């Protein structure tokens, strides 16, 4: 049984949140007890600081809110909750939503079109998500909408817009850019060979550096076994930035499970 690190009379009601049940999802399965307590503490603070706004009739239960907060805080487990400053609301649709998109082509013509989005992360505004894809983010599959949008927020802290290079020491920027672009080219080569649907890494990663960072952040936390061996140099840079090693967590958890089986038998 966890001893949760907040007061029972907390006005936010966080002391009554179903944290243990919320932690019971595959993407969080390999966290140590210490990491679970730390993540839950961050998630409680997240819910105190941010407003989750359910749209179009969606109802968010305490369990839903707890799991959303845990996923938001997973990337900043070691960075700190202050890395999520800069927005105050999370807007949540029931399903992917339609937005009016405006973009400028290479010759300066402005185009408008309606597009379906899974999520959005405004630099000086809210994070927008949808509940269907949030639920899919509970798995350890390489897809995680919440981590993706959080990665954009972290990326944008380094300048006016997300660039694929988060806030790292200046001396590391050139190496980061080199390894990130090498990964993009590698992913594009695979797409050219087998097609987008058959590619082992989400093809969206090849579109631009910011999306590559966000997509690979999804794999970093939810499918490290696909990321680490394919891009070992970039993997080490992600470990250094996030101050976490999800692949090592899996290995340590596996060894612990093996030890437990030996004790049982």
UniProtKB/Swiss-Prot annotation:
GO MF, one annotated term: metallopeptidase activity
EC class of the enzyme, as a word: hydrolase
Cofactors that this protein relies on: Zn(2+)
Family annotation (CDD domains): Peptidase_M90_mtfA (cd20169)
Keywords: Aminopeptidase, Cytoplasm, Hydrolase, Metal-binding, Metalloprotease, Protease, Zinc
Main location class: cytoplasm
EC numbers: 3.4.11.-
Taxonomy, superkingdom: Bacteria
Annotated GO CC locations: cytosol
Record has Signal as a keyword: no
Entry's Gene Ontology BP terms: proteolysis
Coiled coil: none
Residues given in the record as Zn(2+) binding sites: 111, 148, 152, 211
The protein's role, per its UniProt record: Involved in the modulation of the activity of the glucose-phosphotransferase system (glucose-PTS). Interacts with the transcriptional repressor Mlc, preventing its interaction with DNA and leading to the modulation of expression of genes regulated by Mlc, including ptsG, which encodes the PTS system glucose-specific EIICB component.
Family, as annotated: Belongs to the MtfA family.
Subunit structure, interactors included: Interacts with Mlc.
Protein name according to UniProt: Mlc titration factor A
Protein species of origin: Klebsiella pneumoniae (strain 342)
Name of the encoding gene: mtfA
